[in-house]
Amino acid sequence: MEDQMNYYRFSREQWKQFYRNNQHQVPLTAANLHEIEAFNDRISLDDVRDIYMPFAHLLQAKYEHYLSWRETESVFLHRQNRQSPFIIGVSGSVAVGKTTTARLLEILFKYLYPDRRTQLITTDGFLYPNAELKKMQLMERKGFPESYDMTRLIQFLNDVKSGKPLAKAPVYSHQTYDIVPNRFDVITHPDILIIEGINVLQLPSNQAIYISDFTDFSVYVDADADLIEDWYLERFKALMKTAFQDPTNYFYPWAIGDPKDAMAMAERVWEEVNLKNLNDYILPTRNRADLILHKVAHHVIDAVYFRKY
């Protein structure tokens, strides 16, 4: 990633110097990290110390400022200061590791604010069910902006941000590659909500209100497209030997067939779907993020970009 005019660029060594307070080191172990890693992603205790603890410290400051501003605003408007969650958006390509980043941020906030409710959802649940995608002839466009029920997603975020005591988000299954009928993640008055998905920073032309209108801080997980392709195909190969072996899995027919055919299919999906989606709709949103985590080989974060203005 080239240097951007509106971002400060910090090397890993520079970034880790911004927070050296050992009193707030989260008691995580390598085993804990393994539990939250998305499949085939990698994260280490060094990453937590060098990258995520400074990041969490920054978010802590942003959160405290947010609470202060909410109080100031309510006094000025002569209105009751209703609970409205601090929302963090996490975006990036398929297979880049944004899920792991979101899960780790959830753990860090739960540690830093044990008396506050932190919850995490993904925008996957707001994809249209496969049956509807087929009716709309959009199965080959799954993951593209038009495959999401944006009206429902925006209404959900509005309910949460408005302080409604309960909001329901549909659940997506990577096992069946579809929305799970009548199953929901229940969001109950969170103080902090992390929302993760490829479309968190997008500005759909048919929407007057965007996901980013509800977020108070956003992070984009970035890497070279060739690296992401490698990670995507590595993950697919690994899943062929594990989750895809389950007869109920959507990809089971590929797992029991010719491996060469399966890999050819995965490569086609990368080229025609994921790479196109990245180049046309995801990567152009990168410069809307407040912070960019840049990865190199082996999912190592080598640089952090922080928005100037």
Curated annotation (Swiss-Prot):
Enzyme class: transferase
GO molecular function, one term: pantothenate kinase activity
A GO CC annotation given for this chain: cytoplasm
Reactions listed under catalytic activity: (R)-pantothenate + ATP = (R)-4'-phosphopantothenate + ADP + H(+)
Aminoacyl-tRNA synthetase among keywords: no
Pfam annotation, one family: PRK
InterPro entries per record: P-loop_NTPase (IPR027417), PanK (IPR004566), PRK/URK (IPR006083)
Localisation per UniProt entry: Cytoplasm
Top-level lineage group: Bacteria
Pathway membership: Cofactor biosynthesis; coenzyme A biosynthesis; CoA from (R)-pantothenate: step 1/5
Classification via CDD domains: PanK
Keyword line: ATP-binding, Coenzyme A biosynthesis, Cytoplasm, Kinase, Nucleotide-binding, Transferase
E.C. number: 2.7.1.33
Residues that, per the record, bind ATP: G92, S93, V94, A95, V96, G97, K98, T99
Gene Ontology biological process terms from the UniProt entry: coenzyme A biosynthetic process
Family statement drawn from the similarity comment of this UniProt entry: Belongs to the prokaryotic pantothenate kinase family.
HAMAP family from the UniProt entry: Pantothen_kinase_1 (MF_00215)
Name of the protein described by the UniProt record: Pantothenate kinase
Organism: Lactiplantibacillus plantarum (strain ATCC BAA-793 / NCIMB 8826 / WCFS1) (Lactobacillus plantarum)
